[in-house]
């Protein structure tokens, strides 16, 4: 799929298809008005006849419009002009791409990027169009024996920008959008893999491949023997019921000209399958517990995007791969575990395992003297109750870092919402026998999980993203979303000083 930007009049575009917008009720966008004028009112006459109202997602494909060089013109319903926001814009792009693909338009010039979207500039509109296009065309069918193929798939998309001065802005948006889309695809592919393939060793192999593909990336794999030597007893306890060895992949990206620049650290929970262990989960939808490694998948995707963008910063990505299974050697409710930090944990529920893996990873990364640490995890069902499936949960111990991440979430459209983590909640994870319990008393489950993790982050600025509600979509159309790769990449772009300014 090839993307480019240009600035020109619609009637002069020689393409398989031109894409322009129509607002409710039957109001032509400025670009559509130009086409209507050059075609002697051909388009407006169709609208008066009632062929298209302009409601969001409505499509009307016109052939051989008078005096227009392109073979076809696709009219796209955009709803009411004043109500066109970022969510509706992305939905319109998605429906447009689907229509172009279905109708055999192998190339198109898209003028939707010239529409006014509340609070968004040309860079954002082009970048979101690229990301949405790539996401719309994503398929995961490598395990199907019969793979459906589009007869004449969309291969080239040109986005028009209002002035030539904005061409460089559009080109940068395409570069950034393609990198984000590449990371999202990598994350989705990992998440959608079946757990009999995507075990901790598979995650490690993908981390090694990333180092093979980019000179700026090195990867170290830490297996169970080294974990024992490091004292990562909590991490090991979670995986000891599985025949698949726990493996932690440490991916280092060095892009800063200053070799001593402190790195940003990203940590991803990588439970390649979470049965719940001895505290076993209900069988309904247990298949979706292959998605319990989506935190690790998103860190992997963000590291891939980062390497493609060649950003001038240092970043360490940690993929905490593990499998939580019941068995004769599995850890039990009632066990007391000594973590790598020396703190002890009473296990109340073996299905609250993500925090037991993450706490040792959080201690491990102290050796990098990080500028900040962000962990990403499908950690709590309570986050789904609190925020649903649209917004990720955010907690942390450093207000400026939390604000940076919220800002990146707004810029990217991959939203997060900060939850409180005041001292009162810490009492909910107290234990009569150990320093803490791995499960809080009823209420505020996402916050008490954050409180647990916070006890292992005293030496650096830290934030936690709970993506339990946003990492995948369940049900018949189940699949990984690739989130929060866009948020993470935007955060890294901002840290590199490459946030967009028109």
UniProtKB/Swiss-Prot annotation:
PROSITE patterns xrefs: CYTOSOL_AP
User: Which protein is depicted?
Assistant: Probable cytosol aminopeptidase
Q: Which family does it belong to?
A: Belongs to the peptidase M17 family.
Location(s) in or outside the cell: Cytoplasm
Cofactor(s) the protein requires to work: Mn(2+)
Q: Which EC number(s) does the record attach to this protein?
A: 3.4.11.1, 3.4.11.10
Q: GO molecular-function annotation terms?
A: manganese ion binding; metalloaminopeptidase activity
Give the active-site positions: 281, 355
Gene3D superfamilies attached to this UniProt entry? Leucine Aminopeptidase, subunit E, domain 1, Zn peptidases
């Amino acid at each position: 799929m090839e993307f480019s930007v240009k600035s020109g009049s619609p009637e002069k575009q020689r393409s398989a298809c031109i894409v322009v917008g129509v607002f409710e009720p039957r109001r032509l966008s400025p670009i559509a008005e130009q086409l209507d004028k050059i075609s002697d009112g051909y388009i407006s006459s169709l609208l008066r006849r009632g062929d298209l109202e302009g409601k969001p997602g409505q499509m009307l494909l016109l052939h051989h419009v008078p005096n227009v060089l392109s073979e076809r013109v696709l009219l796209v319903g955009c709803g009411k002009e004043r109500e066109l926001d970022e969510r509706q814009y992305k939905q319109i792009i998605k429906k447009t791409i689907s229509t172009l693909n279905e109708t055999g338009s192998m190339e198109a010039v898209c003028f939707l990027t010239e529409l006014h979207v509340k609070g968004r500039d040309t860079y954002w509109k082009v970048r979101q169009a690229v990301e949405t296009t790539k996401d719309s065309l994503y398929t995961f069918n490598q395990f199907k024996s019969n793979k459906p193929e589009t007869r004449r798939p969309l291969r080239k998309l040109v986005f028009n920008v209002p002035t030539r001065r904005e061409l460089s802005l559009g080109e940068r948006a395409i570069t950034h959008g393609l990198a984000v889309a590449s990371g999202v695809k990598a994350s989705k592919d990992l998440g959608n893999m079946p757990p009999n393939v995507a075990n901790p060793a598979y995650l490690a192999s993908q981390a090694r491949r990333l180092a093979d593909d980019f000179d700026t990336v090195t990867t170290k794999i830490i297996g169970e023997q080294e974990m024992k030597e490091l004292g990562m007893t909590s991490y090991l306890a979670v995986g000891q019921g599985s025949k698949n060895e726990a493996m932690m992949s440490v991916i280092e990206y060095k892009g800063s000209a200053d070799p001593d620049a402190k790195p940003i650290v990203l940590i991803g929970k990588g439970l390649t399958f979470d049965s719940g262990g001895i505290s076993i989960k209900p069988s309904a939808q247990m298949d979706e517990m292959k998605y319990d490694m989506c935190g690790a998948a998103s860190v992997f995707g963000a590291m891939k995007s980062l390497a493609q963008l060649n950003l001038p910063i240092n970043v360490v990505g940690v993929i905490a791969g593990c499998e939580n299974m019941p068995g004769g050697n599995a850890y039990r409710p009632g066990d007391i575990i000594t973590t790598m930090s020396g703190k002890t944990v009473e296990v109340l529920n073996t299905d609250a395992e993500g925090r037991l893996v993450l706490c040792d990873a959080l201690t491990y990364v102290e050796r990098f003297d990080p500028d900040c640490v962000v962990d990403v995890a499908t950690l709590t069902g309570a986050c789904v109750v609190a925020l649903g499936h649209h917004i990720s949960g955010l907690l942390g111990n450093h207000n400026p870092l939390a604000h940076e991440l919220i800002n990146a979430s707004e810029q990217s459209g991959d939203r997060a919402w900060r939850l409180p983590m005041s001292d009162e909640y810490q009492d909910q994870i107290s234990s009569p026998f150990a320093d803490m319990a791995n499960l809080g008393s009823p209420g505020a489950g996402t916050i008490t999980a954050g409180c647990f993790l916070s006890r292992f982050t005293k030496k650096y600025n830290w934030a936690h993203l709970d993506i339990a509600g946003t990492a995948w979509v369940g049900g018949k159309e189940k699949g990984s979303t690739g989130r929060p790769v866009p948020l993470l990449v935007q955060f890294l772009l901002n840290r590199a000083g490459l946030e967009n300014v028109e």
